[in-house]
Curated annotation (Swiss-Prot):
Residues 19-187, 252-271 are lumenal. Residues 1-18 form the signal peptide. The keyword Transmembrane applies. The chain crosses the membrane at residues 188-208, 231-251. This is Uncharacterized protein C553.06. Its main location: endoplasmic reticulum.
């Protein structure tokens, strides 16, 4: 029973080692050069719902201000972006990076013609999401920021008008170094690894059978508890290796493996 509670406590501790991002003090401002504009307003992120719709026209600027929080403290993430995607065609999307300074204070400014022509011509609204993440995280922090309605004034529409020749004209060369695609594990090695994990678990069952005659697993003595704890540590290590092979990233595996190593060390010292 004690071993069960220790394992449960370790899992909670290891989960805390995996950093989680959040944002605080977030505001969305829509400002206009026209002081009499009715569209200018200021909203807190907490006031914005997924169904909230706000309009962006030719002379208005969308400003986002927020603070990136990592485990309760302001910090600079590796990525902080505003994602705009067509509501009816989600694959049609664009990402705008936010500028993040010391303490996690971030800001982003977006004008109408910063948005690609393909999105300006869309008849549907644009879904806005704020994404914050760091390397090693499989799922970024995502915050919905409502729907953005694009209203291109007739006097400016020619700037956003689409022409078939645009698809044929020379495009600007974008210089970017992409990381190589991840290497796929060798099929034979995958089978060997899976077999070794299963065989090790069978071996652990044999060790457990040898330990049973020597001690009462329900005894409160330190010797029997250490054997139970040691066996549980090895079993958790085997299960952890299998989960790592199937779903965990190397960063998550490192956090969990450190806790398992501590458990094994405590058990070995107690024997």
């Amino acid at each position: 029973m004690k071993g069960f509670f220790l394992i449960a406590g370790f899992l909670l501790f290891a989960r805390a080692l995996c950093a989680s991002w959040n944002v605080e003090e977030g505001t969305l401002q829509l400002s206009s050069q026209d002081l009499e504009s009715e569209n200018a307003y200021d909203l807190k992120f907490s006031q914005i719902q997924s169904s909230t719709v706000y309009e962006l026209t030719g002379d208005e600027t969308l400003n986002l201000k927020f603070t990136c929080i990592l485990n309760g403290t302001g910090a600079i993430p590796h990525q902080a972006h505003l994602l705009l995607s067509d509501t009816e065609h989600p694959t049609l999307a664009v990402i705008y990076p936010a500028s993040v300074s010391q303490g996690g204070v971030a800001s982003l400014e977006l004008r109408l013609f910063d948005i690609p022509t393909s999105l300006l011509r869309s008849d549907s609204t644009l879904t806005a999401k704020l994404l914050v993440a760091s390397f090693g995280e499989t799922i970024p922090f995502s915050l919905p920021l409502g729907q953005l309605s694009i209203n291109v004034p007739p006097s400016l529409y020619h700037k956003a008008e689409f022409s078939p020749l645009d698809e044929l004209s020379p495009k600007e060369v974008i210089l970017h170094t992409f990381s190589p695609p991840p290497k796929r594990a060798n099929y034979f090695l995958s089978i060997c690894f899976s077999v070794s994990v299963v065989v090790s678990l069978i071996g652990l069952l044999g060790v457990w059978q040898k330990l049973l005659p020597k001690s009462n697993v329900y005894s409160v003595s330190s010797s029997s508890f250490a054997r139970t704890f040691g066996f549980a540590s090895l079993a958790v290590a085997e299960i952890l290796l299998f989960i790592y092979w199937t779903s965990l990233s190397i960063f998550q595996f490192g956090a969990y493996a450190a806790g398992v190593a501590i458990m094994c060390g405590i058990a070995a010292k107690s024997l």
